Amino acid sequence: MFNVTTKTMQWGEETLTLETGKVARQADGTVIATLGETSVMANVTYAREQKPGQDFFPLTVHYQEKYYAAGKIPGGFFKREARPTEKETLTARLIDRPIRPLFVPGFKNEVLVMCTVLSHDLVNDPDIVAMIAASAALTISGVPFMGPIAGARVGYEDGEYILNPTVDDMQDLRLNPEQRLDLVVAGTKDAVMMVESEAYELTEEEMLGAVTFAHEQIQPVIDLIVSLAEETAKEPFDFTPPDYSDLYAAVKAAGEEKMRAAYAISDKQERVAAVGAAKEEIIASLTEEQQEDGNLGSALKKLESVVLRGDVVKNGRRIDGRALDQVRAIECQTGLLPRTHGSALFTRGETQGLVVTTLGTGDDEQFIDALHGNFKSNFLLHYNFPPYSVGEVGRVGSPGRREIGHGKLAWRALQAVLPAPTDFPYTIRVVSEITESNGSSSMASVCGGSLSMMDAGVPLKAPVAGVAMGLVLEEDGSYGILTDILGDEDHLGDMDFKVAGTEAGITSLQMDIKVAGITPEIMKNALAQAKAGRLHILGEMAKSLTEASEFSQHAPRIETMQVPTDKIREVIGSGGKVIREIVEVSGAKVDINDDGVIKIASANGEAIQKAYDMIHAIVAEPEEGAVYTGKVVKIVDFGAFVNFFGKRDGLVHVSQIENRRLNHPSDVLKEGQEVKVKLLGFDDRGKVRLSMKVVDQETGEEIVAEKKEAE
């Protein structure tokens, strides 16, 4: 019944297996990839005809982690997988980015790639396995795909690169100072196509070395996919790239000068209007047959690309008149929103971000339910890109894949410089509102986020800045590297290369390459040029932070105290009774973890002190020989019980009440009476022994021996 083909190899410390022919046989291509005991199934289907009038490539990538893969049942009311999590969205983008440029130009049939995590060993991250499975499924499906690709994750510890470090090693790099890198690289046999990383101030040489190491390590995986395809690949889809050379010649003749004049306008809004008008004039000058040609959009885009790119390599000029390595004018302002905890407005040319920081307590941490376990995050970064930022009308709703991806890039860049939670026990939420956009808005979020957190009083290890780089690579090998690219330069260039970091090194690197031929030398030069741009931006940012910002008066204060773990139950009380009383009486928030660390939070310092004193009274031990003020709570024939230390009671024996014989303790005491007592010690059973007669009941001072003898 089944015609199963399996290919296996040793990859690093694990075994990698590719299998096809048993499951989902009606899909155009299905491969189950397994690394260790982590398995991902990738399914590829594609339409045999292009939709009429479609002028873009409709590729859709879905990635889903099934809870059963790790032996778990989903939470929530419905107990089933619902909308994609942030991890699933980011992984789908991770797969999409390297495969999209490898489809044959002109192919616009709908393609669907679905990756499903079937098994997770909690050691090997399924995102790399999914990328390999998707590449293999595309390669055997017959779709016009110029792959295969493969991906690998690289760590960096003690000066050594590590292939595919475990999930635990990568879980929270901020708390694991030995592990300084989480880098994912995808590429073909000959070229790197995509880089995504989180780093801890690594040098340009160390980052480039990691990329090179990863590209070397994926070579045997690509060979394994090719070996699988040689035996199982379907007949290639009969597709011939459209020849629109005659149409392009007509478009070029009709409007090259108009398009060149339009792109010479430096103001974005005016340029967009002029480019649109030039296109309308070009279309109007064409024949009716040419106007109805489905490749007209491609011909116009090619003309734009030629005009935009021509001056970059030949003359070193860009559409806004800047030099290739020149950063746009920068303006920074902090503290502009009075009631927020921290705020910054970062403007670079026609790109602007209003970034706001809010400080919260442990109750505000984000709870993340993942396949490899549940955990909390105390640093959140949310990126919003409303339509008005580019002068358009559009949908407003929940964040899309792009917003989630850009927010995560900025998160990676900034979290490397955050203080340790033990030093700064706050939850930090940064929100970047992109108010204007003309390229590299994610890097504006990095710069604005750094300024905003410092304005809020967050003790960052160092300021962070980011810059977006571009590349124009001609067929003869000549190239131009662009610093701080515009939106048009991003769309029509050959590489999008975002670098963020401090003066000391890189904290985040993201690279998407659209063409082959990007050599290590080009990447090295691009990183060097990016460093110069980053240092320039850091210098501009420093002008707005002449002195350390004070902690916002509107932010909660957090006091941390450590209690013995065996005292935690006493602080919480039966059914939470004690801790609820502390919160109600003091007005402060109280958070206790299993290690005995208690965080007390309030904007009111008196509330914090009240809660601190109440907790201290519960967990502190009375000191032998010390004098305390107490209250009589019960009188018995042999003495009186006095509450003297929080909830702790002790016995004052009738012989320790006064220096004379009493018939009954009630002769001098009554319940509710305030008295001064000295802790004499503890009896054999641990019971507290108190004395009143050795303490002056008026002053609270201990009666010295001489005075007692005189009496």
Curated annotation (Swiss-Prot):
One of its GO terms (molecular function) is magnesium ion binding. Residues 556-615 form the KH domain. Keywords: Cytoplasm, Magnesium, Metal-binding, Nucleotidyltransferase, RNA-binding, Transferase. Residues 625-693 form the S1 motif domain. It holds the Pfam family PNPase. It is found in: Cytoplasm. Its main location: cytoplasm. Gene3D superfamilies: GHMP Kinase, N-terminal domain (3.30.230.70), K Homology domain, type 1 (3.30.1370.10), Nucleic acid-binding proteins (2.40.50.140). Belongs to the polyribonucleotide nucleotidyltransferase family. NCBIfam families: polynuc_phos, PRK11824.1. It comes from Ruegeria sp. (strain TM1040). The keyword rRNA processing does not apply. The lineage of its organism: Bacteria, Pseudomonadati, Pseudomonadota, Alphaproteobacteria, Rhodobacterales. It is an enzyme of class 2 (transferase). One of its GO terms (biological process) is mRNA catabolic process. Its cofactor is Mg(2+). This is Polyribonucleotide nucleotidyltransferase. GO terms for cellular component: cytosol.
